[in-house]
Curated annotation (Swiss-Prot):
It is found in: Cytoplasm. GO terms for biological process: DNA topological change; DNA-templated DNA replication. InterPro entries: GyrA, GyrA/parC_rep, Gyrase/topoIV_suA_C, Topo_IIA-like_dom_sf, Topo_IIA_A/C_ab, Topo_IIA_A_a_sf, Topo_IIA_dom_A, Type_II_DNA_Topoisomerases. Its EC number is 5.6.2.2. Its main location: cytoplasm. This is DNA gyrase subunit A. It catalyses: ATP-dependent breakage, passage and rejoining of double-stranded DNA. The active site is at residue 119. Residues 31-496 form the Topo IIA-type catalytic domain.
Length: 812
């Protein structure tokens, strides 16, 4: 044979070949058929077991024998792929209604691998036989196998709605399917209702089908995801394990009796052990597996004093004790096309398939009954003229002549004459003749019944209903998975997060984190500090606030926008950790810089105002209620003039308060908050201070009119001073202020000012990430017109970047 070479573009060949491969994987491997709910390999395994006679009441055969049968006759692929599919159909934790009975080690819920196929044995479950029932009655199309030597079913008759009953999952090329299993009794009720009322809505069908029913039980949180899945074919459901809190002699413990579908028990136990070490609020003393043949049981022993509800909710959050099931009901329809179907479409496809099966079965049975009745009719005629029949046969030269003579004499067909010639003499007894007559009469009634069925589609649908109800009676069981109506998977943060004191820091490049306050150790004045945050030369801490985990951090940016972040959402980590970018929490713009970090509790905003000060000396006062509905994209807090930017912000709780504003060149002004009228959220503000030359505002602090506290001022080179607030008399807003510190040429410009008491502690953080915690009492009070003293010993390449007062939790 001459060689033929076809010249073709490699691009075209790759496209064509890959498309063929893709469709082969989609249609022939990974996606189930909507009619019988089986992937090709599963269908071939069940058909192969039927061919081997492995019914539920027959003896087991080695799995290797089954795999060999399927691989050699129907599925010429890897033996392990076939064995894995066989194993899964036998696992009660994988299939809601297993189709295969396994004998031996077929794996476990701990994801232990099954024994080799040469050791295990299998046979069909009785329910699997229902999927194959009537396959010998021309109910489904039979197609050639891979080499054309045998035939196999294109789809099984599937008396049971296997697609939704057992679900399916698979990944093809460019598409995937993930269909959850359901309760058979609920499916039968819904299918029956749809047969009775083809116009039933999905919402009406959901009165019968409550939701997925996983083999491992669990709780589905809410019905929204279920409804969306049934309406669109896609949906996400939160599934929780079932856990109970028990009081024992040794203390409190949590006992898990059910886990989410698809979760490995061993992996879950390992996850619990890991989070117990890494999440400080999960106070777990010990985890052990007490599962046995009676069921699953994981016992979590809690530390003394631990709140079990707190621990349980944190386990839901941090482990696979709570998972999300993403449903994607993609199937292969009757035309061999992948299609995303909703609940009603799947039901309609199944009913249509069953209609065809029942119709073809009835037609087959009618044909067989008609053929048999035809024969019996001839035998009956012969029985009425036995002597004549015997004479004809005896006087005929051969069988052919006898057949012709019988046809002519009795007026029968060739088939009937052939049956008469093949009839045994024993059939000529009176008893046997009576049986023939009776059988013929019964067949006539059956033929009438079959024709009646085929005469009206309603009769076929009634048969479908009857067979479904018989299935429910035999295989239906109680629902295993509970459904929580409210669907609230959120838990009260106050129940699970202790309101511990933390320090929130923000770096110049926008990294934010929360650190437990206890991680900052006390040092004396002049100490070199400890590393507070890992930074680089190009990044350093710019803002720090002492707050609590249940407060909100308010980030005010240079562009006048306010961002609100729940502190419990912040990464709570060590001093040396860099934290996470603000962009992980809020949608801060690239050209914005953080100018102030505040703390507030949502329930305490009623009488509070946000005071914003700009670099060019503007100030505004806005009620905090205006910011309640803040968005992750931020909310505008002030309208800025060209060239101006926000430099600081604070929280005011009373009009009796005053505000002290410090400038870069050591000037300070103090005036009453009442001189700033409340404005709208987007107002531009009023003049706060008259600035000289290129001087700029660096900070603003809010205080009471009569206040025995002190103003702590720090400079770039670590020089600070603590001056009684009484030294700064109130002035009118928009004045030039008074001198606060001298010797700036030696100490560097002012970084900021804070109001402190003798009991307060101050955290000073430098550009290079060093931090020092200083008791305010260690800094000797001085007058207003002084140079200050050294409070932080800095390295040559370092400067002070920011400072904050460590406050008691009650003050936050």
């Amino acid at each position: 044979m001459p060689e033929e070479i076809i010249s073709r573009s490699i691009n075209d060949e790759m496209i064509t070949s890959y498309m063929l491969y893709s469709m082969s994987v989609i249609v022939g491997r990974a996606i189930p058929d909507v009619r019988d709910g089986l992937k090709p390999v599963q269908r071939k395994i069940l058909f192969g077991m039927l061919e081997l006679g492995l019914r539920h009441n027959q003896s087991y055969k080695k799995s290797a024998r089954i795999v060999g049968e399927v691989m050699g006759k129907f599925h010429p692929h890897g033996d392990m792929a076939i064995y894995d599919a066989l194993v899964r159909m036998a696992q009660p934790f994988s299939m809601r209604y297993p189709l295969i009975q396994g004998q031996g080690n077929f794996g476990s819920i701990d994801r232990d691998p099954p024994a080799a196929m040469r050791y295990t044995e299998a046979r069909m479950q009785r329910l699997a036989e229902e999927l194959l029932a009537d396959i010998d009655k021309n109910t489904v199309k039979m197609i050639p196998n891979f080499d054309g030597s045998l035939i196999e079913p294109e789809v099984l008759p599937a008396k049971a709605p296997n697609l939704l009953m057992n679900g399916a999952s698979g990944i093809a090329v460019g598409m995937m399917t993930n269909i959850p299993p359901h309760n058979l009794s609920e499916l039968v009720e819904a299918l029956t209702a749809l047969i009775d009322n083809p116009d039933a809505t999905i919402e009406e069908l959901m009165e019968y089908v409550k939701g997925p029913d996983f083999p491992t039980g669990g709780i589905i949180m809410g019905r929204d995801g279920i409804k969306k899945m049934y309406e669109t074919g896609r949906g996400r459901m939160v599934v929780r394990g079932v856990a109970e809190i028990e009081e024992a002699k040794g203390g409190t413990r949590i006992v898990i009796s059910e886990i989410p579908y698809g979760v490995s028990k061993a992996d879950l136990i390992q996850q619990i052990a890991n989070v117990a070490q890494n999440v400080r609020d999960i106070q777990v003393r010990n985890v052990r597996d007490e599962s046995d043949k009676r069921g699953l049981r994981v016992v979590i022993e809690l530390k003394r004093g631990a709140d079990p509800n707190v621990v349980l909710n944190l386990l839901y959050k941090h482990t696979q004790l709570q998972t999300t099931f993403g449903a994607h009901m993609l199937v292969i329809d009757e035309k061999k096309r992948p299609k995303l179907m909703n609940l009603k479409e799947i039901f309609q496809a199944f009913i249509k398939h069953r209609y065809e099966v029942v119709k073809r079965r009835t037609e087959y049975e009618l044909e067989q009954a008609s053929k048999k009745a035809h024969i019996l009719e001839g035998l009956t005629k012969a029985s009425r003229a036995i002597d004549t029949v015997v004479d004809i046969i005896r006087n005929s030269k051969n069988i052919q002549e006898a057949s012709v003579n019988l046809q002519e004499t009795l007026e029968i067909t060739p088939e009937q004459s052939q049956a008469i010639l093949e009839m045994r003499l024993g059939k000529l007894t009176a008893l046997e003749i009576d049986k023939l007559v009776t059988e013929y009469a019964e067949l006539v009634e059956k033929i009438k019944e079959y024709r009646e069925i085929l005469s009206d589609d309603k009769n076929i649908y009634q048969i479908i209903k009857k067979e479904l109800q018989e299935l429910e009676a035999q295989y239906g069981d109680a629902r295993r998975t509970k459904i929580s109506i409210d669907g609230n998977t959120d838990f009260n943060v106050e129940d699970v997060i202790p309101d511990d004191e933390v320090v929130v820091t923000v770096t110049k490049k926008g990294y934010i984190k929360a650190t437990p306050l206890e991680d900052y150790r006390k040092q004396g004045r002049g100490g070199k500090g400890i590393r507070g945050v890992k930074t680089t030369d190009a990044d350093f801490v710019t803002n720090v606030v002492s707050t609590t985990r249940l407060s909100k951090t308010v980030v005010i940016t240079s562009k006048g926008k306010a961002y609100f972040i729940n502190n419990y959402e912040l990464e709570c980590t060590s001093r040396s950790s860099r934290g996470k970018l603000l962009a992980n929490y809020v949608k801060i713009e690239p050209d914005e810089t953080v100018q102030a970090v505040l703390s507030v509790k949502r329930e305490e905003v009623a009488n509070k105002h946000l005071i914003i000060t700009t670099r060019k000396g503007k100030i505004k006062r806005t009620p905090f209620e205006a910011f309640i509905n803040s968005r992750t994209s931020g909310i505008k807090a002030i309208t800025l003039n060209e060239g101006d930017s926000v430099v600081d912000a604070g929280i005011s709780t009373s009009e009796e308060e005053t505000i002290i504003i410090s400038t870069r060149k050591g000037m300070v002004i103090r005036f009453p908050i009442s001189q700033i009228r409340p404005m709208g959220r987007t107002a531009a503000g009023v003049k706060a201070m008259a600035l000289r030359g290129d001087d700029e505002v660096v900070s603003a602090t809010i205080v009471l009119p009569v206040d025995e506290r002190y103003l702590f001022t720090a400079t770039e080179r670590g020089v600070g001073k603590r001056t009684p607030l009484s030294e700064y008399r109130p002035q009118h807003r928009a004045g030039m202020g008074v001198k606060n510190i001298y010797g700036l040429e030696r100490t560097g410009y002012v970084v900021g000012s804070l109001v402190v008491t003798n009991e307060d502690e101050i955290i000073v953080i430098t550009k290079n990430g060093m931090s020092i915690r200083i008791p305010a009492a260690d800094i000797r009070p001085t007058g207003r017109v002084t140079k200050g003293v050294k409070v932080v010993e800095l390295r040559d390449d370092d400067t002070v970047a920011s400072l904050a007062v460590v406050v008691d939790q009650a003050e936050v």
